[in-house]
A protein has these predicted regions:
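Glycine/proline-rich, positively charged
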Residues: 36-140
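A cross-domain feature marking catalytic cores of carbohydrate-active enzymes
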Residues: 1-2, 29-31, 72, 100-102, ...
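Generic structural signal for well-ordered alpha-helices
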Residues: 10, 14, 53-57, 83-87, ...
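Aromatic-lined glycan-binding groove of carbohydrate-active enzymes
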Residues: 137-178, 214
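N-terminal binding-site loop/beta-alpha segment at the start of enzyme catalytic domains
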Residues: 1-24, 63, 91
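Conserved, mostly hydrophobic/aromatic
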Residues: 1, 13, 27, 56, ...
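Terminal-tail/helix-coil boundary detector
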Residues: 147, 171-211, 225-230, 237-283
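Glycine-rich beta-alpha junction loops
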Residues: 31, 104, 130-134, 156-163, ...
Length: 283
């Protein structure tokens, strides 16, 4: 996204991809959160979308992005304005496809209605939080998107790191972990840092061992069992973490394992469709 690391994430990625054949990879980014101090340096107004996209292309050193996403829903901008701007970006060739992140079913349905009425290009992807512990999309967002041909690209399949098992009940969080980093996600992980959840997570480790997986691999594999998902986003601070996590790709979990997981954590799972992992300060 444009705002990660104060826009530096896109700059670093652009440099890393220099010399790599553009057709060999897919590039995704997002817009919404503040990228500067100005009133128009945020949100989904036509002005910010156009300026943000142009700035992202410059930082990424490319002529287009494959998927451009609304990082959140903007309650202060008319939806027609936002969708019109996205449509113009596609028609200009700067964007190939559009999507959204953390929108609820009502917002998605409203957008699709406008896109169909106006003849705009439709959304093709949803990027919500989803994990064993966070299933708020299952009751409303997934059925709607499935019916409308919108796939899920989920984030935080290991619940901000809680589903690695490194956070132990009754003990302080490891130094340097997300739970101790107030600028790097301590608030977001707080909903999972409860004793009943941490105790249950430890009980998942023997289940992972049964299928020769680490707990993180089991968590990612669990997410990928959902047929409505196209992919899962994994984060890492070390190369070894990436090597471990990608081993979950292609793993098939049988029903007995899936049932065993639900037996351990079923009562602790968040399913409320009204919940959002990152509260919208503009809502």
């Amino acid at each position: 996204a444009d705002m990660y690391a104060g826009t530096r994430a896109e700059t670093v990625l652009g440099k890393a991809l220099k010399g790599v054949r553009r057709e060999s990879y897919e590039l995704l980014t997002k817009a919404y959160w503040p990228t500067g101090p100005g009133k128009n340096d945020r949100g989904l107004s036509r002005k910010h979308i156009m300026e943000s996209c142009n700035a992202s292309l410059k930082r990424l050193k490319t002529d287009y992005v494959d998927l451009y996403q609304a990082h959140r829903f903007d309650v202060e901008t008319p939806l027609e304005e936002t969708l019109g701007a996205f449509d113009d970006l596609i028609r200009s060739g700067k964007v190939l496809y559009i999507g959204f992140s953390e929108w609820n079913a009502k917002q998605i349905a409203a957008a699709l209605k406008i896109q169909d009425e106006k003849g705009y290009y439709r959304f093709i992807s949803s990027q919500p939080q989803y994990s064993m512990l966070w299933r708020v999309i299952e009751s409303e967002v997934v059925p709607l998107c499935s019916n409308e041909g919108i796939s899920q690209i989920v984030w935080s399949p290991i619940a901000q790191g809680v589903l690695t098992g490194k956070y132990l009940p009754g003990q302080k969080a490891p130094a340097g972990s997300r739970a101790t980093d107030k600028k790097g996600g301590a608030d977001m992980i707080s909903s999972f840092m409860k004793e009943p959840i941490l105790n249950a997570v430890q009980k998942l480790i023997p289940i992972a061992n049964k299928v020769d997986l680490t707990l993180a691999q089991l968590a990612i594999a669990w997410v990928l069992q959902n047929p409505n998902l196209s992919s899962a986003i994994i984060g890492a601070t070390k190369p070894a973490q990436i090597k471990e996590n990608i081993k979950a790709a292609g793993v098939k979990l049988d029903k007995s394992i899936m049932d065993e997981i639900d037996l351990v954590i079923g009562g602790l799972v968040e399913r409320d469709p009204a919940k959002n992992a990152s509260p919208n300060p503009r809502a």
